[in-house]
């Protein structure tokens, strides 16, 4: 009985060692170029992101028509601002649209901040 157990255990041990030794040799084949499905999926995702950004830009332009205009057009940060309102929408490179909103600063606010930094009241 004991010899039968030792034989079975040794055979099992040999099978396990052989399987573990063969495991590193088994690898998935590397794909050199993407499949058609991956290309199609990438195109769909890109088109969907562009559509989302376009809808977001239209929504902001309709909801805040004054927000896309510079406070003083002649002193606008970008010259394209007068002719092309889309200059206010920037892409951060990660697929996000950033809306550059111009804030109308009052002279009293500016003077108050300058006085506060200088130590005055």
Swiss-Prot record:
Topology of the protein relative to the lipid bilayer:
Single-pass membrane protein
Output the InterPro entries linked to this UniProt entry.
Uncharacterised_F46C5.1
Pfam family membership, one: DUF5380
Quote the subcellular location field of this record: Membrane
Q: Which residues cross the membrane?
A: 6-26
Q: Which UniProt keywords apply?
A: Membrane, Transmembrane, Transmembrane helix
A Gene Ontology term for the protein's cellular component: membrane
Q: What is this protein called?
A: Uncharacterized protein F46C5.1
Source species? Caenorhabditis elegans
Q: What is the lineage of its organism?
A: Eukaryota, Metazoa, Ecdysozoa, Nematoda, Chromadorea
